[in-house]
Amino acid sequence: MEPSPLSPSGAALPLPLSLAPPPLPLPAAAVVHVSFPEVTSALLESLNQQRLQGQLCDVSIRVQGREFRAHRAVLAASSPYFHDQVLLKGMTSISLPSVMDPGAFETVLASAYTGRLSMAAADIVNFLTVGSVLQMWHIVDKCTELLREGRASATTTTITPAAATSATVPGAGVPSGSGATVVPATVGSVRSHASSRASENQSPSSSNYFSPRESTDFSSSSQEAFPASAVGSGERRGGGPVFPAPVVGSGGATSGKLLLEADELCHDGGDERGPVVPGAGLRRPTYAPPSIMPQKHWVYVKRGGNSPAPAPLVPQDPDLEEDEEEDLVLTCEDDEDEELGGGSRVPEAGGREATLSISDVRTLTEPPDKGEEQVNFCESSNDFGSYDGGGPGAGLDDSGGPTPSSYAPSHPPRPLLPLDMQGNQILVFPSSSSSSSSSSSSQAPGQPPGNQAEHGAVTLGGTSSGALGMPGGPGGTPGGTGSGDGNKIFLCHCGKAFSHKSMRDRHVNMHLNLRPFDCPVCNKKFKMKHHLTEHMKTHTGLKPYECGVCAKKFMWRDSFMRHRGHCERRHRLVGGGGGGGPGPGGPTGPTLPLKRESPGAGGGSGDEASGATPQSSRRVWSPPSVHKVEMGFGGGGGTN
């Protein structure tokens, strides 16, 4: 080993770099993770700058004559609607329905790049429409929350200091002597928001634009106290939707602008307090919905059972407390499957549970008023108990169906009748009660041998036995007729009701002016599939309708029906004028194998004329008088 070099002073010099020992190698299993959280926002900001400058934009969107340029990747990642348009259909130019506001769409398009959305309070409905069409559910949920909040702010009341603690949520921290303006503490106004949808590609018609809780009376709910742990849990109770807590802002109310974060999908479950309006005069402007929005059309669910009057609510187990407003729910999305699948359980105030099913659902045109009896379109008559030989409602559970284990009369005298999948009422009665009940449609399987139940589908009528088609009523027959308005539980925002969800969705597409059915030949778009089927006949030249009298073919059914009526009438007139023709009971025109002939074919030999049958006499298209002259010439030729 060479000695280390010495300096002139005799000190050892450092070794050269090439002679230094190599660094120790890192372990093979060690992995270094580096995170750059600012890259995501910087990337979106850069893409937004490119969009504003028109760089690298590969798709154009047209809204009411205005054109917007954007990036396909960003649109497909932010909207399921654009995902289907640019990926599945490969479109580079997209035309949106004219119902959308161009200004609102421009703001929503910018929010896809920035994650921020700024809107005026008066334009929330326009943003709600844009979010519904584009299936951007976080915007729909936020706009729905703001609309509910704006409507609830109009019903706020100034309460006295003595009642301040009873109207607010316990633990809210409001001083008893402050005299502040407090929003009435209801379950619908203090629950946190929990958005639940069946899928990302859900139809916009299934969106809950409004909650029925704002139109209810707050006078009774202000006297009941709810613990803070009973709200804000974000869970569904009783199958009803959980509504967000309206938070009345203090800073944005004065400027008239609402600044929203697009990625704020739900509230944190931290401090759950009753919303208190900061200040005396700061309130959101009252929202007046247009005609296409729902006007207090909600579905009312009535609790079944003959339970005694509930005791006054006291703080107890949060899961057992229920407000009287839980009776108002919306039938949409996955709640329909829960109701059709046997009903859901709603805990009542006293700790008991009541079964809710589709038979308990009825449609209201106005919110329920306290002290006013609601008309139940699904109730039976008072003499319904005569079918089972027991008390009223015997053999029916809370949902209106037969129960094998209990046939005791324990229900009110006007029980609810169940509905089948098509929305028809089902009458339930024992087969051994009367002779008329033996003519029912079928027996329900799984019933006790001595008390088998039969049922038949009837239409909804009045509350009398004759209107329900019961034999006991005057002129009542099984399957009586009546109006079926009670079966239409699927509501549109314009006020129309439908008995099936698919019919309601198709009707909503008409509102949105959507034309999803394209012609592959001429690219013409149609709203209905059968319209496209009829349109395809113009390209194929198919004429499927043929007249049985003159063998003429038609492409359209209405033209064929109009021609056939005229053709048959002319044949009857021609056939009735000839002597020896068939009477009114003879064969009609469509059943005769006739062909069109010229008028000159009527003359011929005597054998032809004398032996002419009624069928051959109808071949000439002429009035009856001319027809007689032709037959006379033919007869003369035959005798000569």
UniProtKB/Swiss-Prot annotation:
Keyword terms of this UniProt record: DNA-binding, Metal-binding, Nucleus, Phosphoprotein, Repeat, Transcription, Transcription regulation, Zinc, Zinc-finger
Main localization category: nucleus
SUPFAM superfamilies in the cross-refs: beta-beta-alpha zinc fingers, POZ domain
Biased composition (Polar residues): 192-210
Matching InterPro entries: BTB/POZ_dom, SKP1/BTB/POZ_sf, Znf_C2H2_sf, Znf_C2H2_type, ZnFinger_BTB_dom_contain
Family the UniProt entry places it in: Belongs to the krueppel C2H2-type zinc-finger protein family.
Name of this chain's protein: Zinc finger and BTB domain-containing protein 22
